[in-house]
């Protein structure tokens, strides 16, 4: 594979991957880099995907593309560690972070980021989802994301630029990562992005939200999305016990109010009695987003109660 000298690289596109076929994404991004005309590199870090054939196919495509590297971890390290590893490995002055379950939908994705590179320390391009549900087993995630997409227009994200932060599709100066890192204590799914946004704010890093969205294609099944939600709520509870993310999440803030009102015990009991009914709805073909919000709140309260009892 052709390589540029270390001092020649202007832009590094950095992709975290775990069990996703990212061949089309690599080909599309490589084409974008060629049209952009600058000197760049693409680096993929595979977080020890279990599907060997899929990984082999990704590596095969990466090796056929100039200035593209595909690395594989020897064990699963989590998104936060992987993003820090990629930032350290990158040779470009500017870094574009992308999740592997993304799809490029317009020809000026790279050029658009490059055009606005001096506007802020971090540019957030955003994301959107398909207009129709590709899988009836993914109805909960589809409905949840489509509702969230209404708030993902750049000007709406800009109202609260740090609280709307997601690392799914961002561009940053490499210098940023000498001051702010993804928190590597976030080993499991959830909240590493939000915590990074909090740290950016603390360090006075500027964020600018632009319309340069990628399509998110990784719609989990209802079962998978609920499992991920449970893991993310445990992550949030652990972070808050360490004094992090205080006041930075809606579900955590509401749980705090319920605790101040002396109703946490009652909420925990209600969850025990209604968990089965809630899951029956959420795993079905017509899940309610209202019930999903109720589930998350009650689940978080229960997780926190269990953690408090263990620590006593």
What are these regions (language model features)?
Residues 1-31:
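N-proximal low-complexity "stem/linker" segments adjacent to membrane-targeting elements
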Residues 29-72:
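Acidic donor-binding segment of Leloir-type glycosyltransferases
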Residues 73-90:
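Glycine-rich, basic loop-to-helix element that forms the pyrophosphate-binding segment
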Residues 95:
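Short aromatic/hydrophobic "clamp" motif used to bind/position activated sugar donors
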Residues 107-139:
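Conserved donor NDP-sugar-binding/catalytic core segment of glycosyltransferases
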Residues 142-162:
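Short, flexible, basic/aromatic active-site loop/helix in glycosyltransferases
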Residues 188-196:
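Acidic donor-binding loop at a coil-to-helix junction in glycosyltransferase catalytic cores
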Residues 231, 248-312:
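Non-catalytic, C-terminal membrane-associated alpha-helical segments of glycosyltransferases
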């Amino acid at each position: 594979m052709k390589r540029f000298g270390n001092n020649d690289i202007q832009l590094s596109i950095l992709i975290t991957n775990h069990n996703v076929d990212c061949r089309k994404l690599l080909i599309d991004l490589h084409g974008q880099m060629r049209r952009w005309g600058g000197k760049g590199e693409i680096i993929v870090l595979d977080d020890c995907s279990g599907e060997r054939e899929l990984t082999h196919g990704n590596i095969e495509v990466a090796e056929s593309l100039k200035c593209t590297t595909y690395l594989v971890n020897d064990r699963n390290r989590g998104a936060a560690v992987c993003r820090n590893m990629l930032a350290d490995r990158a040779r470009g002055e500017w870094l574009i972070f992308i999740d592997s379950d993304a799809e490029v939908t317009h020809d000026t994705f790279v050029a658009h980021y490059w055009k606005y590179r001096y506007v802020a320390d971090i540019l957030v391009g955003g994301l959107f989802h398909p207009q129709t549900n590709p899988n009836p087993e993914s109805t909960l995630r589809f409905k949840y994301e489509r509702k969230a997409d209404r708030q993902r227009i750049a000007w709406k994200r800009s109202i609260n630029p740090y609280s709307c932060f997601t690392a799914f599709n961002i561009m940053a100066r490499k210098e940023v990562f000498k001051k702010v890192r993804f928190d590597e204590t976030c080993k499991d799914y959830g909240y590493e992005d939000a915590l990074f946004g909090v740290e950016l704010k603390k360090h006075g890093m500027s964020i600018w939200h632009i319309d340069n969205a990628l399509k998110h294609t990784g719609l989990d099944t209802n079962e998978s999305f609920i499992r991920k939600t449970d893991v993310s709520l445990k992550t949030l509870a652990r972070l808050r016990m360490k004094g992090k993310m205080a006041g930075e999440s809606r579900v955590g803030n509401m749980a705090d109010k319920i605790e101040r009102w002396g109703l946490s015990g009652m909420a925990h009991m209600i969850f025990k009695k209604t968990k089965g009914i809630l899951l029956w709805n959420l795993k079905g073909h017509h899940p309610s987003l209202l019930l999903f919000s109720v589930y998350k709140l009650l689940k978080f309260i229960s997780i926190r109660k269990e953690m408090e009892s263990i620590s006593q």
